[in-house]
Amino acid sequence: RSFGVNPNFITPKNYKFKIKNRAGENTANPHKTELGGMGIFANGVLATNPSAGDHKLPGSTVYPPIGFNYNAVHLGIAYGVDTGGGHPEANGSYHYHEGSFLYNNWHTSKIYGVNSYYNLTNFNEDKFRHIDGHSKIIGYCFDGYPIYGPYSYTTSTDVNTPVIQMTSSYKLLPNANHRPKDFRYDKVVEVEGIGNITLSAGSLIQDYEFKDSYGTLDRYNGRYTITPDFPNGTYAYFLTFEKDDVETRVDYTITIASGVNGHGSGNKYY
């Protein structure tokens, strides 16, 4: 157990989900999602977006401003997010908020050895990529569309174009003018067991804005694309993790669209 100040423990869970398989389709019906699982990964762990909702920051008395949501990934130290990118909630259910598990935890025979899909082919010994470098399916969203790792073709409809890392189209707002005056980027909160935490840029979901074509993906962190699994094309989500010297853009499981349009925790494509 290593969840910092998070007092919760992981307990065994038996999940049974009915998912309508929409892989191979491109049918859109966008809507908000509630807090909770948005999909499930091949290792049985639930996928969620990065929103921690509008509850007070753990170990403190400070709630986010009305209409804002804390970002559990950016504030991972307060939420007890581990090296896999997840943590348990009060009922003992463990879930991922972001994609560290793919490079910190999955490159082991204990994970990819349980499923022949990951063992059949590899790209430079990376068993979570097809032989041409395209990512493999690592889970399914509950709307029925597949979730891939971060690599896909430069041109979504041309397998002969180079494989590149998919990037989010969400960008950190350069200043805190969208926040209330008492919640600027230098806002400091005292957290029990940790000390002072600065609610810097990215601490709130609403610190990000969608910029069309800023990255390779749409506002749901997906796109319609040809893949080795679906040569005729499918809509698919992509797990993205990308950082640079200026800002952390996105290191999340499905989408950072969560909460952008209000009180809800996320958006789905279907």
Locations of regions flagged by a protein language model:
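Solvent-exposed N-terminal domain segments of exported/luminal and surface proteins
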Residues: R1-G84
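Core of folded catalytic or high-affinity ligand/protein-binding domains
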Residues: N43, A52, L57-V114, F142-D143, ...
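A short, polar beta-strand/turn micro-motif
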Residues: R1-L35, E98-T154, R249-N261
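Extracellular/lumenal glycan-associated surfaces
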Residues: F41-V45, A90-Y103, F230-V250
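A general structural signal for short secondary-structure junctions and capping/turn motifs
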Residues: P7-I10, G37-G39, G84-E89, R129-H130, ...
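Extended, compositionally biased non-globular segments
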Residues: D143-Y145, G149-Y270
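A signal for specific C-terminal beta-sheet/loop modules enriched in small/flexible residues
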Residues: T61-V73, K110-D126, I131-G139, P162-H178, ...
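Generic structural hydrophobic/aromatic packing signal, biased to beta-strands
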Residues: F17-I19, I40, A47, G84, ...
